[in-house]
Structure formats: structure tokens, C-alpha cells
């Protein structure tokens, strides 16, 4: 069962917390984004109502409708958890959800198109953009000062730009870089 469109992966379940069905979540990003969610989509389970959320460094604990025992929580271990994009809280300026970057054009320093962001991966120490281009796909580190997120008047992302001093070959073979 694939996650529905217009959802963002928040992280994955680490295992039970306590004996009443709490589930620890490894959170991609800020755990505060989970605190006010009314529901989450769980791999293999579908939409579940969030009864209560607790902050627990470095992630959170979710108490979900229908998950009332340690055994039920254990069954969720390793499953991905998603939120509806519309349910996510607004972020501070300069921060973006992954779903806001998907589909953005990738341009060189002169504004010429190079490809499009297909996905975003959290590799731990930095985010990687999966960019589709004429030569296939490439991983592009979302790393200043060479790769910048360009924003519009709304402050939301509009494009990804490689700077003039970006190392050659960032997008691999087949991409026409400046």
C-alpha cells in the first residue's frame, strides 16, 4: 500500500513505548511538527487518528486510535508514518517541507533548465535531491553555497539553482550544466 498523494513522510516507528500502545517515532526533521496532527497515515494500516502525542528526544511518541497494547505497537516497528500535507504546521522562513521541493525545476546559474526534483531523501547529515534530467537521474546535495532554494514573493520555494561556482559534474553525465 503506497502512501496517498499529498502526504509527506514524517519518519518511521521505532517500537513500543510503555504498555498502553504508545509508539516511538524516529522523526525526519523537527518532532514539533507531529504535536498537533489530527491523524497520520501508516504503511500497511492506512489513516489512524492521533489520540495523543508526546515529545521524546530525539523523536516523539504517538498514541493512535486502535493501537492500545504493547503488542499492537510492536507490530508497527519499522513502518513509515506520513502526514497529510494540509495538516502540517507552517514552518519558519527559510525552512521547507520535502513535498514543497518535489516538482521544482533545477536551473544553472544562468537560469537555464537542467532538470526537475523528483524526490528528496534525508541521508542523515544532509538532504539529497533526486533530480531527473536528460541523462537520467542524479543525487544533488542540497548544500549551500552551491545549491540554493529560490523563493517567490510568498517565501515558498519556486526553483532550485546551482550557483556559478558549483563544482562541475554535480548532476552527472548527460546533464547540461553551466
Swiss-Prot record:
Primary location group? cytoplasm
Write out the transmembrane intervals. Answer: none
Top-level taxon: Bacteria
User: Where in or outside the cell is it found?
Assistant: Cytoplasm
Keywords (alphabetical) are:
Chaperone, Cytoplasm, Ribosome biogenesis, rRNA processing
Any single Gene Ontology cellular-component annotation: ribosome
Which Pfam family, giving just one, matches this sequence?
Answer: PRC
The record describes its quaternary structure and partners as:
Binds ribosomal protein uS19.
Similarity comment text for this entry: Belongs to the RimM family.
What is the designated name of this protein? Ribosome maturation factor RimM
Taxonomic source organism: Deinococcus geothermalis (strain DSM 11300 / CIP 105573 / AG-3a)
* Gene field: rimM
